[in-house]
C-alpha cells in the first residue's frame, strides 16, 4: 500500500474530523481487498470532500464578515503603484497576514481616496481565505 496515499487520506480524515487511526484504515483496506484503483478512488473522494468543505467554510466566513462579495476588494486587484511613501513594502506585506500572527496592530492612515478601505477589505478577505473570523465595518457606520 502506498504510504503517501494513506497519509493523504488520513489528512483528509483529520480535516473532515473523521475519527479513524492509520492502523484502522490500513486494516479496513486489507480486510476488504482494496485494489490500487480502489484506494485511488477513496483518496479522490475524500480529497474532493475536503476541498468542498474548505470552500464552504471560506464562503461562510465571507458571508459573516459583511465584506462586499459581488466585486471583492483583494490585494490582487489593488494598484500598489499608486501608493507612495517609505512604508509601501510593509503595505504589500500585509497579504501574508504576518501582522495578525505576530499580534501587531495595523493602522491605515491617509487622505480620502488613497485605498485605505480597499486595503482593509483585502486584508479581511485574505483572513477569510485562511478561515479566520473577520467583521468589516466602515468608520462612518460606527457613528450610527
Task: Indicate where each model-derived feature is located.
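Short loop/turn elements that form and flank the Walker-type P-loop nucleotide-binding site
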Residues: 101-103, 130
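A short hydrophobic beta-strand->loop->alpha-helix junction that borders the nucleotide-binding pocket
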Residues: 137-144
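N-terminal pre-Walker A segment at the start of P-loop NTPase domains
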Residues: 73-97
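Post-Walker A helix-loop "phosphate-sensing" segment adjacent to the P-loop in P-loop NTPases
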Residues: 124-137
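P-loop NTPase catalytic core of nucleic-acid-dependent motor ATPases
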Residues: 89-101, 109, 123
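Interdomain "pre-motor" coupling segment immediately N-terminal to P-loop NTPase/helicase cores
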Residues: 14-70
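Walker A/P-loop nucleotide-binding motif
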Residues: 103-119
Amino acid at each position: 500500500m502506498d504510504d503517501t496515499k494513506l497519509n493523504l487520506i488520513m489528512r483528509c480524515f483529520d480535516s473532515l474530523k473523521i475519527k479513524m487511526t492509520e492502523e484502522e484504515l490500513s486494516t479496513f483496506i486489507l480486510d476488504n481487498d482494496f485494489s490500487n484503483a480502489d484506494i485511488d478512488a477513496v483518496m479522490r473522494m475524500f480529497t474532493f470532500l475536503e476541498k468542498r468543505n474548505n470552500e464552504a467554510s471560506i464562503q461562510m466566513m465571507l458571508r459573516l464578515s459583511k465584506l462586499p462579495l459581488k466585486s471583492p476588494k483583494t490585494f490582487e486587484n489593488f494598484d500598489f503603484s499608486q501608493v507612495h511613501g517609505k512604508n509601501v513594502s510593509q503595505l504589500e506585506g500585509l497579504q501574508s497576514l504576518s501582522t495578525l500572527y505576530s499580534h501587531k496592530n495595523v493602522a491605515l492612515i491617509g487622505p480620502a481616496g488613497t485605498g485605505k478601505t480597499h486595503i482593509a477589505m483585502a486584508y479581511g478577505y485574505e483572513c477569510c481565505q485562511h478561515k479566520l473570523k473577520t467583521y468589516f465595518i466602515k468608520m462612518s457606520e460606527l457613528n450610527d
